[in-house]
Amino acid sequence: MSGAGPASPGRSGSALPLPLPLSLSLTGDRKREVPAAGTLLQPIIKDVGEIYSRLLDHRPVIQGEIRYFVKEFEEKRGLRELRVLENLKKTIFETNEDILPKCKQSMHDNLNEVLQRLQAANDTIHKLQEKEHEKRKIQADKLMAGEEKRIAQQETFLQEQQSKREEVDEEHRKAMERLKEQYSEMEKELAKYVSF
């Protein structure tokens, strides 16, 4: 991992210098150099420092993001938001001062005209309703008069029928009496002839 990516200053080079290799005497008068522990640990310490700076130290990344945000907001945009807000303020002021009063006046004039038309239409409808009500009342009165006349005619008819029925019943009773008398006389005459 050594040499890959940026290392934070003071971190990767913070390894302590280690002593140079020591020479050891071995049997047989051969001198052999044994590498010192510090020389083996230096690359490991350097790699650990780089890993630490990449995983745990986020200051360089955050500082870069902050610089980018400030640059984007202040330098690139400039006074664009301020100009937009000033244009909105100007538009609102013009609307409040010029357009809104004109709209109110136009609406007031048109609404008065519409109100007058509605009142005229309402009066006309009211008159039509009164005429319709009068026609219905006259028609209902005619129907009531016709109903009363029909009831009177029916009562007269029923009375006439009753009197005619009584007359017919009386005639029938008289005819029955005549027939009884006639048959009784015929029986008497027949009884005279039977005795012979």
Curated annotation (Swiss-Prot):
Record's GO cellular component terms: axon cytoplasm; BLOC-1 complex; microvesicle; transport vesicle
Pfam family, one: Muted
Protein task: Component of the BLOC-1 complex, a complex that is required for normal biogenesis of lysosome-related organelles (LRO), such as platelet dense granules and melanosomes. Plays a role in intracellular vesicle trafficking.
Record organism: Gallus gallus
Keyword Signal part of the UniProt annotation: no
PANTHER family per record: BIOGENESIS OF LYSOSOME-RELATED ORGANELLES COMPLEX 1 SUBUNIT 5 (PTHR31784:SF2)
InterPro entries cross-referenced by the UniProt entry: Bloc1s5
GO biological process, any: vesicle-mediated transport
Keywords attached to this entry: Coiled coil
Name of the protein: Biogenesis of lysosome-related organelles complex 1 subunit 5
Assembly: Component of the biogenesis of lysosome-related organelles complex 1 (BLOC-1).
Phylogenetic classification of the source organism: Eukaryota, Metazoa, Chordata, Craniata, Vertebrata
Source organism superkingdom: Eukaryota
Similarity annotation: Belongs to the BLOC1S5 family.
Coiled-coil region list: 103-196
Keyword hit for DNA repair: no
